[in-house]
Design a protein with these regions (language model features):
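A structural signal for multi-pass alpha-helical bundles of membrane permease subunits
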Residues: 5-266
Length: 266
């Protein structure tokens, strides 16, 4: 790699890190210091902003609510997408291409299109302000994406493996769990990553379909806006803590994501 390319990468890397550093910097400042002027590091280091989040029930429950419905959504999306993707990759039937395209069109539509139908449906059947409501709503977008990614990985697995397993006496569930899934574990890791991240950062549906009991952290962060202004320090601390789950997920699936870029539909 030439010096020029390294310099460009360094500048790009710094460009990405500056907002994160500034957010972290603000989280250790008081609101007065933040509004007082620019500084590269806190003049009066304080943990009060984080103390507010960890002691205020509405704040830490927002994180727990988000983690709960995001994990639930990822689990449901993978459970539905795995057999569906296997069917699309292994079998040919009338209208399979049209069905696959129709499935993907759900992912292309913006969440606002489905907002009112979801709100009216969940309100009428008693699912409003529940974790499962948000998880199921996000499945409308994550399942098509998961099927698309997994179908690409499954298509790269030779069909002869299926036939050999059946000849050896494997039932389909046993073959699928013990043989096939380990072969596409990279695809599952990539799919879980994208499902998790979409559900974690999505705000419109999560905020509209919840009120109190299942309110996510993204919606809780908006309540820092009040008549007295914005509590920038607490908002910055909440932002830092919101980044951490995504960083942990990326760390655990980093190898699978790299393989996904090389082999799958990523």
């Amino acid at each position: 790699m030439t010096l020029r390319k390294r310099l460009v990468l360094l500048i790009y890397f710094l460009f990405l890190l500056v907002p994160i550093y500034w957010l972290l910097n603000m989280s250790f400042k008081s609101n007065t210091e933040i509004l007082g002027g620019l500084s590269l590091w806190p003049q009066s280091f304080t943990l009060d902003n984080y103390r507010v989040i960890f002691t205020d029930r509405s704040w830490y429950e927002g994180y727990l609510n988000s983690l709960y419905y995001v994990s639930l959504n990822t689990l449901i999306s993978l459970s539905v997408a795995l057999p569906a993707a296997y069917a699309f990759s292994r079998y040919r039937f009338l209208g399979d291409k049209h069905l696959f395209f129709w499935l993907l069109t759900n992912r292309m539509a913006p969440p606002a299109v489905f907002l009112l139908p979801f709100f009216q449906l969940y309100s009428s059947i008693g699912l409003f302000d529940t974790h499962i409501a948000v998880a199921l709503a996000h499945c409308l977008f994550n399942v098509p994406l998961a099927v698309w990614i997994l179908e690409g990985f499954m298509s790269s697995v030779p069909k002869e493996i299926d036939e050999t397993a059946y000849i050896d006496g494997y039932s389909f569930p046993k073959f699928f769990v013990k043989i096939f899934i380990p072969l596409i574990r990279s695809g599952i890791g990539v799919t879980a990553f994208f499902c998790f991240m979409f559900s974690w950062v999505e705000l419109l549906l999560a905020r509209t379909l919840t009120s109190v009991d299942a309110k996510p952290i993204a919606a809780v962060m908006t309540r820092t806006v009040s008549a007295s202004g914005i509590d920038w320090g607490v908002l910055a601390a909440a932002g830092v803590l919101t980044i951490i789950p995504g960083m942990l997920v990326i760390w655990f699936v980093r190898n699978h994501v790299a393989k996904g870029f090389a082999l799958g539909r990523v």
